[in-house]
């Protein structure tokens, strides 16, 4: 069974790499998104140290647990009533402590709704802050 699973993951990595022009070694298939988030946040903390992850207030514990388990701090942002996602305007004016370092931002598409303008703005803000965008 383990050999079959390993072979399946190898084939999946090859297919994903082929479709995206990347390397198979770049892909880390996981069973659930929260497991992938855990891998990402562990890596962020190992490279950047202590800090926070900006996430939206309207979410579930399975989206916050990987942040906490990795040793980072969740920093909650207000959501927009029209998108149910992070309200970028409020994040832009959110006061940060002088020693607070935002290492990542979570872009959650609540109910599968994607607001392209807000997504672009949040991605740009993450870049300006030097934060990893986790979508």
Name these PLM-found stretches.
Residues 1-7:
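N-terminal "arm"/small-domain region of PLP-dependent enzymes with the aminotransferase-like
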Residues 40-100:
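Conserved PLP-anchoring active-site segment centered on the Schiff-base-forming lysine
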Residues 36-38, 61-64, 115-119:
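Short, well-ordered alpha-helical microsegments
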Residues 10-52, 66-68, 76:
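Phosphate-binding glycine-rich loop
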Residues 29-32, 55, 104-108:
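A short beta-strand submotif of the Rossmann-like class I SAM-dependent methyltransferase core
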């Amino acid at each position: 069974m383990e050999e079959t699973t390993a072979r399946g993951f190898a084939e999946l990595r090859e297919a994903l790499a082929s479709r995206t022009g990347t390397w198979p070694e770049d892909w880390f298939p996981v069973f659930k998104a929260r497991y992938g988030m855990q891998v990402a946040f562990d890596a962020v903390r190992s490279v950047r140290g202590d800090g926070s992850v900006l996430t939206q207030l309207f979410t579930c514990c399975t989206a916050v647990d990987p942040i906490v388990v990795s040793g980072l701090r969740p920093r909650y942002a207000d959501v927009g009533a029209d998108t149910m996602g992070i309200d970028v305007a409020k994040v832009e004016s959110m006061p940060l402590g002088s020693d607070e370092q935002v290492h990542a931002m979570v872009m959650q598409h609540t109910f599968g709704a994607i607001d392209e303008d807000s997504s672009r703005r949040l991605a740009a803000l993450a870049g300006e802050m030097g934060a990893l965008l986790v979508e």
